[in-house]
Amino acid sequence: MCGIFAYMNYRVPRTRKEIFETLIKGLQRLEYRGYDSAGVAIDGNNHEVKERHIQLVKKRGKVKALDEELYKQDSMDLKVEFETHFGIAHTRWATHGVPSAVNSHPQRSDKGNEFVVIHNGIITNYKDLRKFLESKGYEFESETDTETIAKLIKYVFDNRETEDITFSTLVERVIQQLEGAFALVFKSVHYPGEAVATRRGSPLLIGVRSKYKLSTEQIPILYRTCTLENVKNICKTRMKRLDSSACLHAVGDKAVEFFFASDASAIIEHTNRVIFLEDDDIAAVADGKLSIHRVKRSASDDPSRAIQTLQMELQQIMKGNFSAFMQKEIFEQPESVFNTMRGRVNFETNTVLLGGLKDHLKEIRRCRRLIVIGCGTSYHAAVATRQVLEELTELPVMVELASDFLDRNTPVFRDDVCFFISQSGETADTLLALRYCKDRGALTVGVTNTVGSSISRETDCGVHINAGPEIGVASTKAYTSQFISLVMFGLMMSEDRISLQNRRQEIIRGLRSLPELIKEVLSLEEKIHDLALELYTQRSLLVMGRGYNYATCLEGALKIKEITYMHSEGILAGELKHGPLALIDKQMPVIMVIMKDPCFAKCQNALQQVTARQGRPIILCSKDDTESSKFAYKTIELPHTVDCLQGILSVIPLQLLSFHLAVLRGYDVDFPRNLAKSVTVE
């Protein structure tokens, strides 16, 4: 649950100050992944010192605190220039060990900083490895699993059979001992100007920038088997044989820069040319040449890694005129929902085509059951669309929380189609559920917002929601785009159902009008801010609804609790008499979502029960709903759309309310405590 960033300049002169600025800016782009501590490792010597040395600077708190700490280092000359240099940086969200400078990354192999490493993920067998290393005399400073990796590579180096063992060989041996998930980047005094990076289960990509022509667009994958017995004869020989055709470099050994990161948002301002590493890839840069190798070959392996061109633009990841990324992303929803539909929904012919699914559509139509799996907000998007998916596909639809799905060892069959929803495409529980379903022969479909993510690569087919980068930890625009993506899937499945044509056309007309209706809802921000002024001192809040808007209540309550730290509960109105009614009194704030849909009369019954107990309901209702407003303490009137899409409009006031509540309570909206954007650990 961390952010990795590293920068290598080869034959590109950079001052230490410029290197610091590049590393810090990269971390700031990744701060949404974790922000309880941060650190960097750079070359510490100032040319007049012959002995190589790595300088570590680590600080508890956000990246800004680290930035301030860097300029307090009297021992480092910020003006000294490096023609070739490799620096690594890390922003952390604690999984092992409390937030502190000693537990932050980079972690070191020893007090001499011979090897340093940054890590995103969890090593599940670190206790066994630590016990072994302690028995060999290695002393530990931190409580982290990552320090075990740093000590382990030092152990492998100390026990090397040959003096000229390569850096990548050391890393290869280390990862063969690791269990769990990791993305790792290593730096060492023994290999100046070299970098090694590897991943298994956690995302990692490499950006490349050069004003000169690059040697290749396809980096061939090299294979070898390194064992204690044959390392001298095989590994050493093969690495020496590497020629320029097996590596990526600037033609003529010219200047080139490499950027390593957990996420493309940290790289895009430097370059849009990237290589996505796959599980168990080992990428090594030496003398300005990037090579990629793997220990074992399998039939499904691609023979190379292609350089891909990212379409993301820098301004997409900046706040603009908004005070927080979350606020910006709420107001981007007219554009993001349009982008989700663009090129997919033909409003003239009333047809829908999801290009990522078209080759598998016949197989999907033959399935017996749909299983939709997600966590948090992604799960709520599945709940929100379950009813319309059942209606349009005429199939049973199971909606599952990924962790519970795995805990139950849920039966999955070859004629099931399983959807995996994740904004980042890296959510650990969802990824494990994907692998569980693949092992049982089900067809797997990814619904993600991140090209090249683990879920998008490992599923059989998928839908890119195309919502644009979402930086705020609390998901907003990704939710509405996930919602629409699933509705579009239902529309595509029902295209040949004559009995459903009127319903399909109604929904497609509703999709067409959504961007303008969302703008209308966003114009209510001032009214919602006034409501927040009344509520921000409260300690608890109930959000109640049913039918299509039950998911709205769950999602709204989640937004409120995760960024305002108020207790908030989404309640199915049909369950009111089975317990929650006991909470209702004149002090308890209650938000009710009551729309003109098939559940309207039943919601009126719930409203009567709330007011009979002296409740003072705040009602989200349709503009023409005079009946509900008679019993409301306050109303927020929303434009009306087709019932199955109403949840997109009704969730936005709750997103805005949670934002303003958090601001009024004095909390950091984009970085709520104890949470991170991309949940890459179980």
From Swiss-Prot:
GO terms for cellular component: cytosol. Its EC number is 2.6.1.16. Residues 2-288 form the Glutamine amidotransferase type-2 domain. It catalyses: D-fructose 6-phosphate + L-glutamine = D-glucosamine 6-phosphate + L-glutamate. Coiled coil: none annotated. This is Glutamine--fructose-6-phosphate aminotransferase [isomerizing] 2. It comes from Homo sapiens. CDD domains: GFAT, SIS_GlmS_GlmD_1, SIS_GlmS_GlmD_2. The gene is GFPT2. The active site is at 2 (for gatase activity). The modification Phosphoserine is found at residue 244.
